[in-house]
Amino acid sequence: MPEAPERHVFVYGTLRRGGRNDINRLSPAPDYVGMGEVRGVLYHLDWYPGLALGGEEAVTVVGEVYRISAELEAILDGIEQIVPGADSEYFKREVEIAVQGRPVTCLLYEINPVHVRERRPMGHGDWIVFHHG
């Protein structure tokens, strides 16, 4: 049976190390690849953030990149409440993330723009520093 293709995920909020939903506490365990960066806008939604890619107010958003299994990807989809259609709070995207100067194709959970229309951007690219600062 062929091996499943390698998957990576970029986590920028509560799934980061030390966060409320720390990915390292999930099973099957992910493999840490390194710190990553992407341009976008972070929004403080309550006890968690939402990231919109690009935009006029984009900053460098930092996060962690992990190699994950298909089983863990399904668990993450549940945590992020991914549902078919336009009503999902997050959309799962595949994007290029800069990891130590090299591009890595990663899954990223991007906030549905409907959920941030009336929100102000954080103006900061590191949720952990913002949240614990």
Regions found by a protein language model. Give the residues of each.
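Glycine-aromatic micro-motifs
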Residues: 1-133
